[in-house]
Amino acid sequence: MPKTILRLPGVKAESGLSRSTIYLRINQGLWTKPISLGGRTVGWPAHEIAALNAARIAGKTDVEVQSLVRKLEMERKQVAV
């Protein structure tokens, strides 16, 4: 299964959130941290954005979303092995 990486404009389009809100949520633990694509370029795995959107649509609490964020970021490390 191919892993698509979304740059910030794609993440904004998929989530409906502004840049400042995305980075605020990262600081609150409610959004996954971006991955480095080299230089100053960052992106997010598309499946993570889909999972975060699904959690919000399902009405998950902030605590549940924070747990999901930790799980998604841990999965990144397992995929790399």
Predicted segments with their positions:
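A short, Lys/Arg-enriched interface patch at domain edges and termini
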Residues: 50-78
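Short Lys/Arg-enriched helix C-cap and helix-to-coil transition segments
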Residues: 35-41
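Polyanion-binding surface elements
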Residues: 1-28, 51-58
